[in-house]
Amino acid sequence: METQAVKTIRDELRELENTVAQASDMVLSEQDHRNASAIREMTQSVIAMSKENSLISVSNEIDYNEEIGNLAIDPSLIDEKIKQSNNFVELLKLTHLEQEALDYFLRYTISSTNTLELESTSDPKFVSLENEVTELENKTLTEHRDKIQEAKKDISDKSKDLANKQDQINELCLGAANSVDECWKMLNELEDIHSQRDNDVKETLSQDTTTTSDLIEETYKEWSSLQTSLTELNNSKDELDQLIAFKNEKHKDNDSTKIRNANIKNKTITENVKMLKLLINFWESNFIVPGSKKSKLSNLEVYPQTKKFQFKCAEQYTVIIQLNQNGGSIKSIEIFENDGKSVQENKNLSSLILNKYKNPLSSYPIFQVINDIVEELK
């Protein structure tokens, strides 16, 4: 079952995936529109030139009013066609100059009142004027050709730059899509890890379980045995006190060392009695009257082989206590919380309880620690 964090990540990934898809579609649409616009402009230019210049023609089968998308023009052939047209124009110009240069010059350049006496085309004056015309013509053509070459180079550079930027944008979109795919893979792996952890927790909680009725019966027997042991312990304490008092009176001077040892033993017995009383109060308040309002615990389960026991507290908490090897003190505490969807370890609660103890857990009575846990979780 997915957690809130996984659900949030999943929603963010979906949103990011939609954003990348929209950006990619927009980029591709802009590129298609730009290419279509360029082809449309070239097509319109060719059509316009074909109408204004008889040297350029378009197939008669093409309807000028039809959609541009149906008019097929290969831009790669334009340079070759332009070169062919330029060669053809040059031939026409040479022919025209050879046949009409003299007539054109005489009619529009030389005044009728100041005629030149030219005997032939080899006349020095004619040759000089012809050279001047050719020089001016070549200069003008060179300037125009330079401008055309410069414009062509500028167009080529901008086209290459635009193509490079388009490639970079496409690579960025592809990289973003690949990153989103990787995020989806990692999210699936995270869900598998969460699922495996939940299964491990459930398996741990279900090992070595005993029935509730057997547990209550066993607990009651242990409680009865503890009551008997406590009575015997109190009797032994009274006898020990009498014996110590007797020895103090009879061997006051000679047995001081033995008395100190007896006092130490008496102190240990007193601590044991106190712990047994805590145990009796704990069992009486939590297990002897199952289901009563005083009961704060339920589902007590004991695992003798692993030296673990667990119980439920406040309905949604399950507490697992690991005892030391000798079974007389606590080694560690784990608290699991059921939020209605899954069972997960609540490390914050565990840390909060452990921080209350300045010394190691093994130095505190077991049932004192359990009571503290119950009070914290109730």
Curated annotation (Swiss-Prot):
It comes from Vanderwaltozyma polyspora (strain ATCC 22028 / DSM 70294 / BCRC 21397 / CBS 2163 / NBRC 10782 / NRRL Y-8283 / UCD 57-17) (Kluyveromyces polysporus). Residues 1-32, 130-172, 224-277 form a coiled coil. Component of the KNL1/SPC105 complex composed of SPC105 and KRE28. Part of the ten-subunit outer kinetochore KMN network that includes the KNL1, MIS12 and NDC80 complexes. InterPro entries: Kre28. The keyword Coiled coil applies. Its main location: nucleus. It is found in: Nucleus; Chromosome, Centromere, Kinetochore. This is Outer kinetochore KNL1 complex subunit KRE28. Acts as a component of the outer kinetochore KNL1 complex that facilitates microtubule-kinetochore interactions and the spindle assembly checkpoint. Kinetochores, consisting of a centromere-associated inner segment and a microtubule-contacting outer segment, play a crucial role in chromosome segregation by mediating the physical connection between centromeric DNA and spindle microtubules.
